[in-house]
Design a protein with these regions (language model features):
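Catalytic active-site module of serine/aspartate enzymes centered on a nucleophile-bearing elbow/loop
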Residues: 288-324
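Conserved alpha/beta-hydrolase "acid-adjacent" motif
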Residues: 272-278
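Alpha/beta-hydrolase
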Residues: 174-261, 273
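Conserved hydrolase catalytic core segment
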Residues: 126-164
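Catalytic-loop region of hydrolases
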Residues: 1-47
């Protein structure tokens, strides 16, 4: 489903440490049916935050099944926002600041979105937050710090902190980007492009089920890798580096008990996020939460729509209770 891109320009935005940028752009898309209370406030806003471009996305692949069987476009008003630091919205590449862009945190990212919502939409309370992968970091940070601001959260393939093997991956990504010879020069360069290809290759290695990769021959893996690299070839080194630095500081484990929203967590293949290590602990750490798994029974790289039926039914049942 193609969604028309919209741009809202905020007069200014102040980062936590005090730096202010002016004429700050926010890229967003909307779909669904808005509903309002008697005072004109939007009551059914559901915000969505995606994972890395190019890697396997449960929500992208299961979207057709969930939407066609749940009729949510008539009940929810979805707002898909490009967060702070990502191209389209205010980011190192889109502002032209590149390596001089302000260093930001997830607290900055939440303040960025909240300011946008105040300026663009009339909302007292968000109905729900949906996040996948690193998009889940935003949702969990928000639900921990401002637990009264949403009714539900829905998280797919994410984690409560960047640590262990995932921190090692982030450090390797940092080393690759720091080795760029002309990092502190503006414009295109071969070294920047080569290093981003290396970054994408590392992400690819951790983006899907090891079981599935072991059942593919090298030609099939090469074809999948080329598709992945085509999607990521225009990734900007500055956007990625600042986002990577932000993610390495992410840790909300000790705050998960603050969450008041009804919560659904879905884990899928053993990829960048591990179900047992990353997703299952939410069952004990987050009050009033449900944790389910999309079982990896496939021998092929791609799932078909019917493969999402078991988990899709649980997702639909969870979301049904929030229809206004």
């Amino acid at each position: 489903m193609y969604l028309e891109k919209n741009i809202h320009v905020m007069d200014s935005f102040e980062f936590e440490y005090g730096r202010v940028l002016e004429n700050v752009e926010v890229e967003y898309r909307v779909f669904g049916t808005p509903k309002y209370d008697e005072d004109g406030f939007l009551t059914n806003a559901v915000l969505f935050f995606s994972t890395f471009n190019g890697i396997y996305s449960f929500l992208r692949e299961s979207h057709k099944y969930i939407m066609s069987h749940g009729n949510f476009t008539d009940e929810f008003y979805f707002i898909v926002i490009s967060p702070l630091g990502t191209p389209g919205s205010c980011s190192p590449s889109s502002t032209g600041l590149n390596y001089e862009f302000p260093r930001y945190t997830y607290a900055d990212g939440i303040n960025f979105i909240k300011q946008f919502l105040v300026e663009k939409f009339k909302i007292r309370k968000i109905l729900g937050l949906v996040g996948e992968g690193i998009g889940g970091y935003i949702v969990l940070s928000w639900a921990c710090e401002f637990p009264d601001e949403m009714e539900f959260i829905f998280i797919v393939n994410s984690a409560a902190k960047v640590s262990g093997y995932r921190f090692i991956i982030s450090k390797v990504l940092e080393l690759i980007m720091d080795s760029t010879e002309d990092y502190y020069t503006d414009g295109y360069s071969i070294s920047k492009t080569k290093n981003m290809i290396a970054v994408n290759a590392l992400l690819f290695a951790h983006s899907s089920s090891k079981k599935i990769f072991n059942n593919l021959n090298n030609d099939e893996i090469t074809a999948i890798f080329e598709d992945f690299n085509d999607e990521c070839i225009f990734s900007d080194i500055y956007d990625f580096k600042f986002r990577n630095e932000c993610s390495m500081e992410y840790d909300v484990v000790d705050k998960l008990g603050n969450i008041k929203a009804k919560s659904l967590f879905v884990g899928t293949n053993d990829n960048y996020f591990n179900f047992e290590l990353d997703m299952l602990p939410f069952k004990e750490l987050v009050p009033n939460s449900i944790v389910i798994k999309q079982e990896d029974t496939k021998e092929n790289y791609y799932f078909e729509e019917k493969d999402y039926a078991p988990v899709g039914k649980d997702v639909i049942a969870f979301l049904e209770q929030f229809k206004k």
